[in-house]
Structure formats: structure tokens, C-alpha cells
Amino acid sequence: TYTYECIPESAGLWAYHDHGPNHTLNTARGLFGAVLIRERDAKIPDVESVLCFHSWTPPVTGLQRAYQCVNGRAFAGNTPTVRAKVGQDLAIHIVGVDDNFHDFHLHGHRWLDAAGDVTDNPSFGPGQSIVARFTVDNPGRWLYHCHVLAHQDGGMAGWMLIDP
């Protein structure tokens, strides 16, 4: 067991992953994640989720394509389900923990990006993170997925369930 201490220089969502001699295997086994650093006086959302987008190629001879995963799992129903209620302040943090570029798309909802523009499909690169933060106003079952079609087809998708 190791304990690490640091003084963060800036707020944000920071990805971590293994850098040891077997880092590819260890990352495939799930040795990655995110650390969220908030500003001291930041308003904490009512509901918060962290989604790590990444690929994984099983070590099987002849397998031609990688799984496209969310938090180590692939395909809606197997990936994390984001849950909230109408009226709640929801923050979904999405981070790329592989070497791919991704587009996060959430059906049925829009929010303001860091520049103040309305979006429902922001792009981000390796090691980068974005946040979809909004007041939930549209009940139902909504799909989220990577808008890179090969990633979506490979399983990078999940559900968001909004209760009235």
C-alpha cells in the first residue's frame, strides 16, 4: 500500500494510470481512474458521475478489434448508468484514459461548455476531461455514447435514467 500526498496547483479532473513495467496489462485490468480537485468554494452538485473512456483489446489470437469501454465495461446496460431526478444539479465528468480522441454525446440534454456555448457533443483528447453540468429537466431514459462511430459500435455507450 502506498499513500501519496500532493498540493494541487489547479482544479479539475485528472486521470491516473499505471506506469509500471506491465502498464498495458495493468491498465487493461482497470488500474486507472480520475481524481477530482475542486476550487475551495465550489458549489457541489447534487449528483455526480465520472466516466472514463478507453479502449481495450483482449489478448486473444485473431481478434481484430478492441472493445471501446466506459469505466472498464462495454455496451449500454453493462456500462455505468447515470441516475438523477428532475430539478437536480447534475455533473458528469468524462475523461479520456487512452490515446484516442472522443466525442461525448448525450441524448435529450444540453449544457454550457467551458466557453459558455451550448453543447451536447463536446470533443476531448487523450488525458483531457470535460464536464457536462446542468439542471436536469427532461425525464426518461437517455443514451450517452462516443460520437466516433467505431467507438460507439465497439461498446462506448451507456444509459442515463432521469426520474420525474
Model-derived features: positions:
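Copper-binding active sites and cupredoxin-like electron-transfer domains
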Residues: 1-164
